[in-house]
């Protein structure tokens, strides 16, 4: 789909009408810090939140609420005639909407899908509300920590992929004539979160999605650094116990599936 790239000084009809249209029929992806923030806001554990409000193993919010006039189900965290029940902890996707964010060559760009401003479909009344610059909108939505978390988790996923490549290239697996590992990587890259969740052992899913780390909502960096350290140590312990080419193959597939997840 075509996207429209934006500059930070561009003024758009970004004042929310609080109609709740964007809280219905969408897909909201979560990283582990966002899940922990939401659970903290609900005063439940991350594991409990994952079961109650997520699908695809905890990587996506469950839209299983009442349907709107378009027949689209509400997010499970949406309350009719009130709005988001966890608004102060809402994830980056919700803070940015209707904008999106993409990072290329270590530079972030803000976009919206298509060529027509998304809110005009379902919330045309925003045209009667004050326009806001993209920069002011981002500041008002307090996206900075959530953008930091998004970028940090992309790096963590790359670290897991690097472990997978190390297992393939530095253990003799590739030289042994193995082709199954690359085949499984390609297949795994085509799977959705639900399908990947079914292939990941429970202890690895929990280590990745709901780590037992205390959250301080004002210190995202410490949470993510602790999470990365735990994943690296768990991966190293796992790798240290391997001996056969089949062991290396299975571990390389596991690490790449973790990266895709």
Task: List PLM regions with ranges.
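Short loop/turn segments that flank or connect secondary-structure elements
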Residues: 1-21, 28-36, 40-261
């Amino acid at each position: 789909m075509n996207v429209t790239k934006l500059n930070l000084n561009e003024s758009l009809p970004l004042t929310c009408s609080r109609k709740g249209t964007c809280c219905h029929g969408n897909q909201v992806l979560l990283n582990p810090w966002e899940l922990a923030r939401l659970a903290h806001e609900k005063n439940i554990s991350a594991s409990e939140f994952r079961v109650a409000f997520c699908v695809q193993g905890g990587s996506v919010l469950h839209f299983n609420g009442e349907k709107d006039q378009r027949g689209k189900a509400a997010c499970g965290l949406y309350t009719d005639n009130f709005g988001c029940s966890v608004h102060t902890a809402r994830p980056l996707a919700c803070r940015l909407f209707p904008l999106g964010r993409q990072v290329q060559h270590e530079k972030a760009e803000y976009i919206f899908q298509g060529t027509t401003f998304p809110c005009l479909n379902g919330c045309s009344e925003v045209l009667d509300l004050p326009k806001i610059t993209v920069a002011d909108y981002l500041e008002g939505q307090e996206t900075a920590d959530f953008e930091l978390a998004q970028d940090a988790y992309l790096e963590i996923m790359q670290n897991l992929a690097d472990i997978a490549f190390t297992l393939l290239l530095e253990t003799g697996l590739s030289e042994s004539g193995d082709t199954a590992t690359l085949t499984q990587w390609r297949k795994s890259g085509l799977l959705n979160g639900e399908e990947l969740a079914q292939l990941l052992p429970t202890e690895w899913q929990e280590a990745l999605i709901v780590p037992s780390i205390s959250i301080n909502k004002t210190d995202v960096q410490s949470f993510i650094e602790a999470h990365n350290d735990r994943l690296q140590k768990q991966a190293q312990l796992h790798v240290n116990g391997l001996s056969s080419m089949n062991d290396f193959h299975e571990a390389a597939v596991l690490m790449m599936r973790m990266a895709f997840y």
